[in-house]
């Protein structure tokens, strides 16, 4: 059984979010939660939220199907970060000039699956 969660337009740069996603790819869901909770990077918070949402989605899916739900059997099957919309801002510079500031956003996707059927 698979469950998926997507967070769109998250205000973290894709490059920084990919660092966090690379840490947890292929790991058990409970282990990934521990890694993200203790990671010092700010990008770990939105990735953790998406992972928790995917686990909750798996719980709901299992309840609907009448299957027993075991969080320890879940692992991260697939996870990736896509680039979202870039917000363009300007900062005033000397002699009437302006410099562009790009505020990048990300779309974070996490897919969790249970071990017995997929691995």
Swiss-Prot record:
The keyword Ribonucleoprotein applies. It comes from the Bacteria. Signal peptide: none annotated. One of its GO terms (molecular function) is structural constituent of ribosome. Keywords: Ribonucleoprotein, Ribosomal protein, RNA-binding, rRNA-binding. InterPro entries: Ribosomal_uL22, Ribosomal_uL22_bac/chlpt-type, Ribosomal_uL22_bac/org-type, Ribosomal_uL22_CS, Ribosomal_uL22_sf. Pfam families: Ribosomal_L22. CDD domains: Ribosomal_L22 (cd00336). The keyword Methyltransferase does not apply. One of its GO terms (cellular component) is cytosolic large ribosomal subunit. GO terms for biological process: translation. Belongs to the universal ribosomal protein uL22 family. This protein binds specifically to 23S rRNA; its binding is stimulated by other ribosomal proteins, e.g. L4, L17, and L20. It is important during the early stages of 50S assembly. It makes multiple contacts with different domains of the 23S rRNA in the assembled 50S subunit and ribosome. The globular domain of the protein is located near the polypeptide exit tunnel on the outside of the subunit, while an extended beta-hairpin is found that lines the wall of the exit tunnel in the center of the 70S ribosome. Part of the 50S ribosomal subunit. HAMAP family: Ribosomal_uL22_B. PANTHER family: CHLOROPLAST 50S RIBOSOMAL PROTEIN L22-RELATED (PTHR13501), LARGE RIBOSOMAL SUBUNIT PROTEIN UL22M (PTHR13501:SF8). This is Large ribosomal subunit protein uL22. The lineage of its organism: Bacteria, Bacillati, Actinomycetota, Actinomycetes, Bifidobacteriales.
């Amino acid at each position: 059984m698979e469950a998926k969660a997507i967070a769109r337009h998250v205000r973290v740069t894709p490059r920084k979010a990919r660092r966090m996603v690379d840490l947890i790819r292929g790991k058990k869901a409970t282990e990934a939660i521990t890694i993200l909770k203790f990671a010092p990077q700010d990008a770990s918070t939105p990735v953790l939220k998406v992972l928790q949402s995917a686990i909750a989605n798996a719980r709901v899916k299992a309840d609907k199907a009448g299957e027993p739900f075991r969080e320890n059997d879940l692992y991260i099957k697939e996870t990736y970060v896509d680039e979202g919309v870039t917000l363009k801002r300007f900062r005033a510079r000397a002699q009437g000039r302006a410099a562009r500031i790009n505020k990048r956003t990300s779309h974070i996707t996490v897919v969790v699956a249970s071990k017995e059927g997929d691995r």
